[in-house]
């Protein structure tokens, strides 16, 4: 169809007392015309070949469109109402009827219809009727096929408005014979009044923004193609529903062996070899509120946790089977306080010890003389989880810490005892190792440890000269037994998660 063609297709046209199927074309003489040109061809081939139409008619002073019921052997009818004539078209399917109606309405502009009842006391005969509004033209029609019984121009009306259970309007002197007050019974009086207000003010309430054409139905689709389209849409909907049900079945829940209902199953109902993995529930971490447990109450808290785990029954034990007791869930602490085994940091290297030392001890400014890195100085929550290693020591299978990097991690100043000045004076020159002069800066050999003054230094020691403070801060490399403190290194077993002390 071209731009001037409104709608075309096969339809039944009333010819005397018979219905004849013809190829009909409804077009506008110009894009701004308020009339329609009806062209009748015997077949579609005549239109394609460019043959002259068999009948042509101009439909002027259009008042509206009315979809009618069965009429003389035709199931669906569409009446094109004009002031002087009515053109009645017949269709075999409701889809074709609605397609023609939608295209004609969009082409004509503001076309509306309402079922009303004419009340007595006016020039019109009382009874049911249809109120048609086509742009500025208002008309009342009745009977089958419909016939115009009254018409008015909207600019010629004196007043109009809704009333309880009805709509009233008054025609002025320009309306001629149809001047006067007319009262219609309708439940859509507010909608009628709204449309009157919009059309009188030049507003199109049913049109979108300029240049946007809605998707109009195709009138050439047959009943068979409509059924195929409906079947295709039904199949697509069933396919989407089956996909949604399949996705929902993959997220089913099942209880774990320890009664933990938070375990997630990865099974699918559509697979014959599907299986549920309920062991995830034993690895799920239980989030608890941080509590402040004193170190002296650490043993009591561990005993309570063991008693609670022992009192919890196992469902599998009721069936006669025996399973090893499940490992108590580890408790997550706040950020920066998790152990190196949880954070994935490898143990036994210089970088891992220096990077995770604060996570084990919680803070470096603790009491003097604490054994850093040991299980006794860990935070309370971590102390409950760490246990001694129970693995057998097999030569060659255990990672050995390199000797050159064994004591190179940063040692807190509160661990090492203050080295007296007499110890430094009594040391032999060979024990000092590769100690450099003050002018050489901060160079140190890999074998010496970094010693700092204790927290209880006197004010005189803080005001020493740079050379004296540097000499007093350097420690021996381990040759003198009285100048070196005992260092405890704690490693975490990669197999069982226990700690080893070396």
Swiss-Prot record:
Q: Organism's domain of life?
A: Eukaryota
Q: Where is the PH domain?
A: 4-109
Region described as Disordered: spans on this chain: 210-232, 249-279, 291-358, 418-482
What GO terms in the biological process aspect are recorded for it?
Answer: neuromuscular junction development
Keywords in UniProt for this one? Cell membrane, Lipid-binding, Membrane, Synapse
Q: Where is the composition biased (Low complexity)?
A: 264-279, 301-316, 347-358
Compositionally biased tracts (Polar residues): 336-346
Please report the record's description of how this protein sits within the membrane: Peripheral membrane protein
PROSITE patterns, sorted:
PH_DOMAIN
- Renumbered to this chain, the Basic and acidic residues biased-composition regions fall at 459-473
Q: Where is the IRS-type PTB domain?
A: 105-210
**Compartment(s) of residence:** Cell membrane; Synapse
What GO MF terms are annotated?
A: lipid binding; protein kinase binding
One Gene Ontology cellular component: synapse
* Primary location class: membrane
Q: What does this protein do?
A: Probable muscle-intrinsic activator of MUSK that plays an essential role in neuromuscular synaptogenesis. Acts in aneural activation of MUSK and subsequent acetylcholine receptor (AchR) clustering in myotubes.
Comment block on domains: The PH domain mediated binding to phospholipids with phosphoinositol headgroups. Affinity is highest for phosphatidyl 3,4,5-trisphosphate, followed by phosphatidylinositol 3,4-bisphosphate and phosphatidylinositol 4,5-bisphosphate.
According to UniProt, the name of this protein is: Protein Dok-7
Task: Report the source organism.
Answer: Takifugu rubripes (Japanese pufferfish)
């Amino acid at each position: 169809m071209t731009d001037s063609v409104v709608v075309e297709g096969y339809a039944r046209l009333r010819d005397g007392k018979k219905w004849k199927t013809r190829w009909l074309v409804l077009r506008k003489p110009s894009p701004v015309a308020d009339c329609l040109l009806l062209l009748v061809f015997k077949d579609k081939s005549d239109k394609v070949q460019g043959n002259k139409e068999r009948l042509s008619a101009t439909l002027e002073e259009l008042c509206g469109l009315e979809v009618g019921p069965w009429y003389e052997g035709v199931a669906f009818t569409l009446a094109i109402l004009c002031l002087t004539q009515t053109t009645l078209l017949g269709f075999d399917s409701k889809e074709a009827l609605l397609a023609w109606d939608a295209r004609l309405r969009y082409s004509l502009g503001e076309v509306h219809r309402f079922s009303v009842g004419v009340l007595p006391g006016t020039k019109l005969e009382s009874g049911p009727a249809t109120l048609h509004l086509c742009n500025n033209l208002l008309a009342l029609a009745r009977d089958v096929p419909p016939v115009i019984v009254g018409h008015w121009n909207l600019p010629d009306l004196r007043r109009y408005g809704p009333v309880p259970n009805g709509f009233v309007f008054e025609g002025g002197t320009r309306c001629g014979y149809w001047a006067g007050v007319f009262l219609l019974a309708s439940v859509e009086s507010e909608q009628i009044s709204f449309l009157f207000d919009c059309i009188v003010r030049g507003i199109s309430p049913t049109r979108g923004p300029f240049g946007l054409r809605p998707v109009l139905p195709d009138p050439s689709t047959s009943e068979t193609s409509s059924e195929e389209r409906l079947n295709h849409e039904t199949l697509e909907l069933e396919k989407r529903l089956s996909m949604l049900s399949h996705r929902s079945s993959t997220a089913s829940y099942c209880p774990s062996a320890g009664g933990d209902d938070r375990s997630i199953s990865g099974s699918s109902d559509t697979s014959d070899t599907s299986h549920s993995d309920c062991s995830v529930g034993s690895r799920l971490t239980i989030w608890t509120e941080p509590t402040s447990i004193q170190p002296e109450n650490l043993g009591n808290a561990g005993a309570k946790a063991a008693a609670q785990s022992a009192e919890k029954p196992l469902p599998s034990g009721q069936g006669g089977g025996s399973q090893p007791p499940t490992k108590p869930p580890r408790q997550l602490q706040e950020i920066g306080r998790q152990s190196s085994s949880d954070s994935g940091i490898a143990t036994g290297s210089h970088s891992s010890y220096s990077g995770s030392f604060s996570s084990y001890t919680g803070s470096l400014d603790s009491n003097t003389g604490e054994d850093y890195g040991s299980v006794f100085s860990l935070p309370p929550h971590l102390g409950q989880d760490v246990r001694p290693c129970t693995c057998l020591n097999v030569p060659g299978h255990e990672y050995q810490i390199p000797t050159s990097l064994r004591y190179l991690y940063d040692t807190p100043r509160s661990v090492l005892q203050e080295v007296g000045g007499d110890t430094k004076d009594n040391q032999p020159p060979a024990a000092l190792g590769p100690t450099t002069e003050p002018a050489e800066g901060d160079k140190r050999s890999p074998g010496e440890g970094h010693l700092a003054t204790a927290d209880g230094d006197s004010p005189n020691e803080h005001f020493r000269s740079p050379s004296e403070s540097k000499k007093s801060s350097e420690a021996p490399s381990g040759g003198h037994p009285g100048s070196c403190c005992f260092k405890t290194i704690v490693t975490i077993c990669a197999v069982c998660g226990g700690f080893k002390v070396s």
